[in-house]
Every structure is written in structure tokens, then in C-alpha cells.
């Protein structure tokens, strides 16, 4: 979503559509490519109405099963804390949420993915789950 609102409080389809359209336009402008049609409710907050609105707009909704407090740019976890939480909580079938605003995530990502591979995990794309 564009503003990352608590979408569970949005019941007006026009407001919901604008959130989705605005982020798609920004993505297109920034990357020069079309954004994939996936919806992740911010903060994991949603209503049945939201899920239906997303579906009506052609989005597939996904939730995460592994996340940690990485979104606060003013209170980033240490490398050790992040690595420990992420390796300790990984599980088969995990959908991992890592915010791109996290400096720590960027710094540990290569090491983290390597560790998960050493633990026997493989990685896939959301589109594989939709099919």
C-alpha cells in the first residue's frame, strides 16, 4: 500500500483502490516495470472486506509467518540480535517479512541467506504459491 495505513479500518472501495493504484504507479515510475499483483496487509491488520476488495482488484493476498521488529529506522536491531532471531525462528514453509528500510537487514542479508541454505532451506517466489 502507498501510505501503509491500517487497512482493516478502510471500508470504502475507492479509498482502498487509491492506496493500491498509488503504490503501483510509484513502483512503475521508480522501476520502469509493472508491480506484481500481491497484497500484504500492513501490520497484518485486515478485514474480510479488505481481502475481498484486494481480490476484486486482481491481487493475491499473502501473509508472513516470520517477522521481527526491523521497520523502525531509529531503533535498528544489532546484527547479532537480528541474525539470532531470524535463524532461530525460521521454519519449513516460512514466508519471511524483511523491511527494505532496515539497514541491519541489508547488512546481514547475504550471510543470513547463506546460513539458511546451510540449514537446508531453499527459496522460492510468491508466484509459485499462487499457481
What is the meaning of each model-derived region?
Residues 104-131:
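C-terminal domain-boundary segment and adjacent tail
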Residues 1-80, 84-97:
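Metal-dependent polysaccharide deacetylase catalytic core of the NodB/CE4 family, i.e.
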Residues 93-104, 108:
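Catalytic cysteine-centered active loop of the rhodanese-like fold, especially the PTP/DSP P-loop
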Amino acid at each position: 500500500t502507498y501510505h501503509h495505513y491500517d487497512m482493516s479500518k478502510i471500508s470504502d472501495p475507492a479509498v482502498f483502490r487509491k492506496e493500491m493504484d498509488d503504490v503501483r504507479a510509484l513502483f512503475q515510475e521508480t522501476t520502469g516495470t509493472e508491480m506484481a499483483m500481491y497484497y500484504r496487509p500492513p501490520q497484518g491488520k485486515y478485514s474480510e472486506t479488505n481481502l475481498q476488495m484486494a481480490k476484486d482488484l486482481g491481487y493475491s493476498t499473502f501473509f508472513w509467518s516470520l517477522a521481527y521488529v526491523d521497520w523502525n529506522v531509529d531503533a535498528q536491531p544489532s546484527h547479532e540480535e537480528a541474525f539470532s532471531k531470524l535463524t532461530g525462528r525460521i521454519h519449513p514453509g516460512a514466508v519471511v517479512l524483511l523491511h527494505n528500510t532496515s539497514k541491519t537487514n541489508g547488512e546481514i542479508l547475504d550471510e543470513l541467506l547463506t546460513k539458511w541454505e546451510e540449514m537446508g532451506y531453499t527459496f522460492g517466489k510468491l508466484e509459485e504459491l499462487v499457481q
